Amino acid sequence: MKKLMTLLTGGLLLAAVQLSAQTAAAKPVIMTTDGEEIRAALVELTQSGDFRYAESLKDGSPKLSIRKNRVRWAWIPKPEEITKADNLLKNKKYDEAATAFAATAKSFGPLGWEPYSKLRQAEALDASGKQSEAIKVLETLKDYANVSPRNEADLSAAYELLVKFYANIKAWDKGLELSKKLMYAGDAAAVSALFARGDILSARASETNSQDDRRDAFNDYAQISLLFPKSSRAAEATFRAYQTLTVLNDARAQIFADKLKKDYPKSDYAKQL
């Protein structure tokens, strides 16, 4: 798979992606407001924000155009610039990574990569001790409208991270409000929403010693454990449910301990029992 990004002197910001014909699922996609799905070989974004695309590599440079107000969302495979920013973050070059992700959020945001870029930018900022800046970055996603199946998980992860930051600064109401917003998305978002709500309720309970908050947090973790057993986070949720009930001196804690050992015996959480 080859990926091409060029800045055209004629005033076009080209985010073009060349893909093998065998990898149809990884082709750039433009979803129009009337529900038409356009699978392209090349996609470019003009400086005015409109889209140009080519349906086949044989067509040469993109000639077909579509106005931005007719695009519900667009997506291209991960650009090389984002992979480079990932490596900066992985190598703990946090300031450089934050700057790089800020740039990719701007350049590739309309092409589906704004949630991912801002999530990673916030992680880099937080790692360098700039949590307040990280919060501001994530808050720009609160009204994000270009949600697609390609970036929904990244958006949910960004919201969940923002809820955790709100918990850190004791902005309980903001965190709970945002977790409610997550509830109305798909299953993956629902798991994130339940975790986010459970975590902020647990954090508030630690501060206020509210048993009601602890019980509500348990309900959130238990829902993930029982309703989404195949989720990659089910073991963690089961452990959190066990922990919360233990703090509440509730005998049902053993039920979740047994479930954790039975259903997720190789998980790190089962090893902590």
Task: Show the residue positions of the predicted features.
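Compositionally biased alpha-helical segments
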Residues: 21-148, 153, 157-169, 173, ...
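Terminal, low-structured helical/coil segments at or just beyond the last alpha-helical repeat
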Residues: 212-215, 235, 239, 245-273
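Intrinsic disorder/low-complexity segments enriched in polar/small residues
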Residues: 3-4, 19, 23
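Bacterial N-terminal signal peptides
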Residues: 8-16
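Amphipathic alpha-helical interaction surfaces
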Residues: 227-230, 266
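Bacterial N-terminal signal peptides that target proteins for export
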Residues: 1-9
